[in-house]
Amino acid sequence: KDFILKGYNLDKGSSHFKLGPLKIISDGSLGARTAYMRNFYEDDKTTKGISIYNKEILQELISTAHDNNMSVAVHAIGDGAIEMAMNCIEVAIKNNPKKDTRHGIVHCQITDEMLLNRFKKLDLIAYIQPIFIHYDQHILEDRVGKELAKTSYNWKTLIDLGVVVCGSSDCPVESFDLMNNLYCAVTRKDLNGYPEEGYNKSQCLSIEEALKCFTIGGAYASFEENLKGTLEVGKFADMVVLDEDIYRCDKNKIKDININMTIVGGDIKYSL
């Protein structure tokens, strides 16, 4: 709160260093059963996880950011945490209506249909980390049950609803290797190729959709879609050169594609 009230907001920064959105961690993780759930965990009926803040404090944090020209990106994994974050964002917007706030939920893993639809209703950005499929598919149903698992990690549904989906690596918790993320997004398999048909395969993204998450989606989230995210005249020439055509290769081999060159602002910064 002190940080925001000192005037740090979305107007600060440069083309290479930009403030915002404000990260707020509201719960824990699915693996540790600390993601905050509406109901008790299926495999531990003694806990619903951990909510870092009560709703009053979370509301104060989100409203302070909203009122002072700062978007929020709320870490919320469990359905209880996601619902609380959405409720607080909705109140902040209702009390101080603004256009183009670009608030979002980070991870947004455990969802039902109502929560998925609220992403669109509230015009929230969904920050996803496809690499989580590698591990979480093996524990998801045990943690939350089969029914809730069906509507969780539903990235394709979010895209079809018209939600802006922003892909990220979750580095340093996970590797910065984005090829593994793209692989998991389009195959819904772990890095060992399991399951053969993909976990909840109806939620597989096309390679075009996955690439948009990690390019246009990220640019939009930082209010920079007019500067980056696509290769167009007048935009930064930020790009990589791959050793294989990602549009044509076997999708199961995406994780094995190498980066031959990195170009930033039209200048080669790395090459083999």
Q: Predicted regions span which residues?
A:
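Short beta-alpha junctions and helix-cap segments that line functional grooves
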Residues: 4-8, 169, 249
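Short proline/glycine-enriched turn/loop segments at secondary-structure junctions
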Residues: 10-11, 250-254
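Metal-coordinating catalytic core of metallo-dependent amide/deamination hydrolases
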Residues: 1-79, 83, 118-125, 130-131, ...
